[in-house]
C-alpha cells in the first residue's frame, strides 16, 4: 500500500464513501506520491539540504529538483502518473512537480483502490439529475491496522518509522488528525503530529523530506492564491454594490 493510498483511505468515510473536506487534498496526495517514488528507488534529489541542515535550509527543500533514476513503469496508475510528471519537467523544482501530480492524484488513487478491492465505486443521481459518486470501504482491514499504528504514535508516544512519520507530516494541518482519535485525545494527538512534522532532518531520508517540504510550500502557495481570490471577489462585490448606474432609475424603482 502506498503512503498516498493510506492518506486517501483516512480521508474517505468507510460507510458513506464521502471524502472529507481536506485542505488541499490533491496537493497532499501528490506529496505522498513523491515520497512513494523515492521509496520505490525511482528518484533522487538534486540540490537538497543534507542531514544537519538548519530549519531555514530545510524549508527551502521544495526547491530541489528531482532526478528520475528508473523510468520503468510500476504498473500502478497513480505512481506511474507521478513518475511521468517528474520525467516531463526534469529541471523543475519539486514543488512544481507536486502541483502537476496533484491534478489527477485523487482520481488515480481511487481507481487503484477500487481495482484492488479496497474500496467500492457507487454511482447514483441526486434528485434524479445530478451524478454522485461515493467510495465506501470494501475491505477495511488495512485501514484498521493503519489507524492502530497511528494511535500508538500520536497518543501512546511510540516513535514512528520513516513511512509513518512521513504520513503524519503530510496529515498535519489537513484536519484529519483529530478524527483518528477520541475527542479527549485530539489536542495531544495534534501536538504530537506538529512535533513530528517539525522534527529534525535526520528523521527521514532527504528524498522524503523534500517531498514533505514541497507539499508544505505548495499548500501555502495555493492557500495564498485562494485567499487573494476571495479578497478580490469580495472587493468586486462591494464595488458592484456601491456602483452608480449609468442611467439612474426613478427613486421609487428598485436599484439593480
Locations of regions flagged by a protein language model:
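Short, amphipathic alpha-helical interface elements at domain boundaries
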Residues: 1-105, 229-256
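Short hydrophobic helical membrane-anchoring segments positioned at the boundary
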Residues: 151-256
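Charged/polar, solvent-exposed surface patches and flexible loops
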Residues: 9, 81-88, 99, 111, ...
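Short acidic alpha-helical/loop segments enriched in Asp/Glu that coordinate divalent cations
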Residues: 120-129
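Short, structured motif recognition centered on aromatic/hydrophobic residues
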Residues: 34-37, 109, 113, 166-175
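Amphipathic, coiled-coil-like alpha-helical scaffolding segments used for oligomerization/assembly
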Residues: 107-121
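Short glycine-centered helix-capping/turn motifs at secondary-structure transition points
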Residues: 41, 117, 175-179
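Short, amphipathic alpha-helical interaction segments positioned at domain boundaries
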Residues: 61-108, 128-166, 177
